[in-house]
Amino acid sequence: MVNLLLAVIYVAFISLGLPDAVLGAAWPTMSVDLGAPISWAGGISMTISAGTIVSALLSDRMTLRFGAGKVTAVSVALTALALFGFSVAPNYWVLILLAIPYGLGAGGVDAALNNYVAIHYESRHMSWLHAMWGIGALTGPYIMGFALGAGQGWSWGYRYISILQVVLTAILIFSLPLWKKRSEVKTGEVSGESDGTANDETRKPLGVRGVLAIRGAKEILVMFFCYCALEQTAMLWASSYMALGKGIDKTTAAMWASLFCIGITVGRLASGFLTMKFNDPAMIRLGQALVLTGICLLYTSDAA
């Protein structure tokens, strides 16, 4: 049962990643259909991010009250509804409104599952969990590319992904008893575990000030801010850059944009093994070196 729940959590993170790179992949086509400037994709992305931030800040309190399973199921359902709304949106401003529930749902899933896995599973599962996100993120543009290539338009690309989210919502609802059983097993274990994790059901919610008071938290937040800026910029603008800057066919550009997510997925899968040999600072330096190499190659292609 424990392995079954872990499989459900992995699938949930695949689902979380599915729509993340789709906006960037589809925007060269969407902007024409909606009569919106290319730069306006940033407004949708920022609205989604704002919803994610709000949801993540409330996640700890909501998870302690309702449980990670219920929070995840409701969040995925909210995301599914928002994505279906994307598929029928008549104009740009409706997309902005729908980006709010989309961001709230995505943030709820992300924070709840990260917290749950950190508490109930070994640390290596965190690397695999985020690799699952990468699988979803690289699959999304291919789904959108398929819809565009078949002449169905970007709306059907979003519709396909919303259907997958609905299926996952049903899976999560049926799996709710597994979440409870896992929590009961964790609660019943000996209190003197090596990781020293406190019972998640008895602690009080940790506010923003409490989090910032943790040693190293501020530095980690700054570092993660920089990482997210890099990740979101590449996912949002890679397809537009190739289609508008390099003259690549829009359908091909949508599919090629997923190569960035393939790199993320492979990197996260490999990191689970590399951490057995290298410490955290070495892993961070290795990642920065690879990023710098990629940026240099990008400028090399411009020069060519």
Placement of each model-derived feature along the sequence:
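Residue-level signature of mid-helix packing/kink "hotspots" within the transmembrane helices
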Residues: 49-53, 57, 138, 264-265, ...
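Cytoplasmic helix-loop-helix junction between adjacent transmembrane helices
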Residues: 100-130
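Conserved MFS/SLC helix-loop-helix module at the cytosolic interface between two early adjacent transmembrane helices
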Residues: 56-79, 83-84
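Symmetry-related core transmembrane helices of the 12-TM Major Facilitator Superfamily/SLC fold
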Residues: 158-174
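Conserved small/polar residues in nucleotide/adenosyl-binding loops
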Residues: 299-304
